[in-house]
Amino acid sequence: MTGQLVQYGRHRQRRSYARISEVLELPNLIEIQTSSYQWFLDEGLREMFQDISPIEDFTGNLSLEFIDYSLGEPKYSVDECKERDVTYAAPLRVKVRLINKETGEVKEQDVFMGDFPLMTETGTFVINGAERVIVSQLVRSPSVYYSGKVDKNGKRGFTATVIPNRGAWLEYETDAKDVVYVRIDRTRKLPVTVLLRALGFGSDQEITELLGDNEYLSNTLEKDNTDSTEKALLEIYERLRPGEPPTVENAKSLLVSRFFDPKRYDLANVGRYKINKKLHIKNRLFNQRLAETLVDPETGEILAAEGTILDRRTLDRILPYLEKNIGFKTAKPMGGVVEGDVELQSIKIYAPESEGERVINVIGNANITRDVKHITPGDILASISYFFNLLYKVGDTDDIDHLGNRRLRSVGELLQNQFRIGLSRMERVVRERMSIQDTNAITPQALINIRPVIAAIKEFFGSSQLSQFMDQTNPLAELTHKRRLSALGPGGLTRERAGFEVRDVHYSHYGRMCPIETPEGPNIGLINSLSSFAKVNEFGFIETPYRRVDPETGLVTGHVDYLTADEEDNYVVAQANMKLSEEGEFLDEDIVARFRGENIVTNKERIDYMDVSPKQVVSAATACIPFLENDDSNRALMGANMQRQAVPLMNPESPIVGTGMEYVSAKDSGAAVICKHPGIVERVEAREVWVRRYVEVDGQTVKGDLDRYKMQKFIRSNQGTCYNQRPIVSVGNEVVKGEILADGPSMELGELALGRNVLVGFMTWDGYNYEDAIIMSERLVKDDVYTSIHIEEYESEARDTKLGPEEITRDIPNVGEDALRNLDERGIIRVGAEVKDGDLLVGKVTPKGVTELTAEERLLHAIFGEKAREVRDTSLRVPHGGGGIILDVKVFNREDGDELPPGVNQLVRAYIVQKRKISEGDKMAGRHGNKGVISRILPEEDMPYLPDGTPIDIMLNPLGVPSRMNIGQVLELHLGMAARYLGIHIATPVFDGAREEDVWGTIEEAGMANDAKTILYDGRTGEPFDNRVSVGVMYMIKLAHMVDDKLHARSTGPYSLVTQQPLGGKAQFGGQRFGEMEVWALEAYGAAYTLQEILTVKSDDVIGRVKTYEAIVKGENVPEPGVPESFKVLIKELQSLGMDVKMMSSDDTEIEMRDTEDDDDHQSADKLNVEVETTKE
């Protein structure tokens, strides 16, 4: 027997074929959401209040400071919020201090700043009763980016951009004449020396001394028309503010506000970190030849003589001195934008590949501290120096798609940005109020208007592209949605603009973003999924774990380092499947490793790190595909995406052939009930589990408090599937923290269970499985194998109208007693009633416009009291295809104190549950992207059967395998059969699972035939089929594309208002479009009358269709069609262009065209009781 037994949770053992022992547990899979939100509550909010404090009025007399904040308790629990359609939120209170500097008076107050939405334990938000997820956004990190370009003559040049988090951009570029230009905030370009002069380096000599003499600089100086700081400032002002009279002072203040004012220009922590890293002098000195001798200024010791080549070792030796004091100098700009000296670090080197000894200056920005969030003159000088260095092949260009240059904005940061917008709007209001109100009577509460803050947060949660309605089809869909990374959204890319490069798989994605899981279609590559072991660091860069190799001994240690993409570029990383000894020594001399995206074979001394696990490359959903390594990536992509569409079944099964990820995914998804404290189970009911805690007291374990865990029973999920939790522990079980107490939907014994293990044969059967169609045995219908439960919610509200309030009642005009039999005395359907399409759910009447009564009606009214009530029937009825059993009814009344929207007096919700058995037209799939539609459900007795008489469950077309190259399904089939014979479950982790020989070994162990195929007998004749057939157990899932949701038929229904043609689509109860090609078909056939009927009375001949209906009802001949409405519309459009269009008959008389409004078709329709609806498109 190969493989070893592994325990997953309390109830499941699997035989695992993994060869690599995992040194690192999988992290909590929704940590990306929870930790980011926690950071926001702990630090993000505080940062915001510190940034905005103090708000001073225009005189500087009053100052408002935000001291501290606290979050209160939420008003309702999460479940109550879902029921009441309210937001799960807690009140935010801020301590505000108002100081009057004239009188020295200080007032402190706690100000309520609105209800702030809270994250649930499972990483979601409940907004207006619906669960939503905030998706993390992948954006370009603020930094300096250099890139090469080739112009049309083939000349090589460069461009560079300084991108802040918010604020103006600085761009540098070269032109064909080797002049270096700068653009300030996307304006017209200026020679770069103009910007240097504006910073205070006024003369040509100063600039040349600073940057070193080179032809690019002299070309630029020639092009530069300014010769002093003042002129440069005026030149820049004219470019930025054309048409305004320039003065030096205005120019200075403009540049200060554009670049050096922390309120207007923000690099954020990450921008400062990236700029310091990029512009540090050490990166450009590597492997260069010194043109000056480096001396330690403190001791006078020579560290490196002129002409020394700075290799890695020399550079490491002088690095501490570089950090401290070598090459530091202070430039003293005169009259520039920013007063004060500029700290720089400058070292001279010889230009590589230059004839003669050309010396170039390498200038660094002398490591500016992290709290300087705006750009400094030092940064600008260093970035310009880097640009000139690049022209001499010193330094590197940047790859914008590298994950070292793209970062994640998770929930916390997205919320913080939104909160910042709200606070800055509030700041304006506060300033205005400070100047208007009486300074003595003023209070913090009176100054602060919290509306803009609340509005900004509401807008973000309600309508931002990144705040999405949670995909709750099954636990895996839920988990994946929380780990999704989107490059779209505000401040990101748009679908149309994104090219191939952005969407492509990049080598830096390894271990950070899944190369498989991404949608098919226009969003491919723009929406990704976080890899299984990845984490996000403080700057928002994605890190992946690696095992450290001890440089002294060369042994692989258990120590794990998390590396970002740009850190990883400095190391050689070995694969996780390298053979190791017990001590951690590499057993092979030559090792396959990765370095900067290249796969190399190297000796073991060069290895710095090793992968922690083979599945660190892929996401949680992809890691659930067994034999992923044998599938083509396109099909694996479909497999990963389709698992998310699996409908929760009534009695699910976890896969016989799994990957070991099923337990972790289910546990972290938020669908299961997790034990919070260790203890012992005291009581188990369908609705709750009681656990008595264990508490440590003086080294003794004693029983403590009782925890009660409530189950969700038959709740409607966001997608209309059934969300139900079932306990899986028994009384007396000792449970530990983090153990699963109850299964959620699509779970069995604590493991993810999206489908069922069924007996599958690869064979054709009378052509019924042509083109991926699936033939299925009736047993799967009878035994409820693929039966799922669906819950739909319908609501009806009684509003106040201009003519009086609507009323929910049993007394509905023109409705017989038979239709009311399931309504209670209030006119609301009873729970448990079985309803069909068109049945009443809630009886409701709306007042009609009151007409003037005739004398007879007034007399009758006087005699009998109430007149025939002028009300319309606006009851809620079951829509087409919505029939089922009433699961629950909820009634909300304004009088009972329920919060309802304005104008609504009563709200009734009815939940209808449907049990959907599998049927022809339903879509099914395996986990390898092998999808198909059920074409035929055969009686059990007609299905082919095994020699022991067992009929198979499903027949798949063998032609679906070779061209698709998803061989994983065949391996799964055979291994599944062997496992069923052996009565075991199997784990075959991705990239480290069962090899071919393991599968053969297990087949042999199970006593199966040595080709793993079987003789099958035809169920109809009892004859054996000619060839042996591959039969085995495959895991098949039923997808959310069900035929019941798609089937649609219409006789009459709503019509469009303008063209009077039937609407389209099932949602509008529309018709089928008879298009251009269908018309050609009937023309070719010569079916003139059928065609005329389709184009007129069945479509938009308004009078004709009513008369036709009338004729059919009365049993008369169908009359001649009239003029279609769309023809009238055409004539009206031509008339609107000023053409006089008339319609003439064959005898030259004008045909009158009546407008629809004057027609009497509505009256005749009323007599016939035909509904003629018109709908605005």
From Swiss-Prot:
One of its GO terms (biological process) is DNA-templated transcription. Its EC number is 2.7.7.6. InterPro entries: DNA-dir_RNA_pol_bsu_ext_1_sf, DNA-dir_RNA_pol_bsu_external_1, DNA-dir_RNA_pol_su2, DNA-dir_RNAP_su2_dom, DNA-dir_RNAP_su2_hyb_sf, RNA_pol_bsu_bac, RNA_pol_bsu_CS, RNA_pol_bsu_protrusion. It is an enzyme of class 2 (transferase). Residues 1147-1161 have a biased composition (Acidic residues). It holds the Pfam family RNA_pol_Rpb2_6. GO terms for molecular function: DNA binding; DNA-directed RNA polymerase activity; ribonucleoside binding. Residues 1147-1177 are annotated as: Disordered. Residues 1162-1177 have a biased composition (Basic and acidic residues). CDD domains: RNA_pol_B_RPB2. It catalyses: RNA(n) + a ribonucleoside 5'-triphosphate = RNA(n+1) + diphosphate. One of its GO terms (cellular component) is DNA-directed RNA polymerase complex. SUPFAM superfamilies: beta and beta-prime subunits of DNA dependent RNA-polymerase (SSF64484). Keywords: DNA-directed RNA polymerase, Nucleotidyltransferase, Transcription, Transferase. It comes from the Bacteria. Belongs to the RNA polymerase beta chain family. The RNAP catalytic core consists of 2 alpha, 1 beta, 1 beta' and 1 omega subunit. When a sigma factor is associated with the core the holoenzyme is formed, which can initiate transcription. DNA-dependent RNA polymerase catalyzes the transcription of DNA into RNA using the four ribonucleoside triphosphates as substrates. This is DNA-directed RNA polymerase subunit beta.
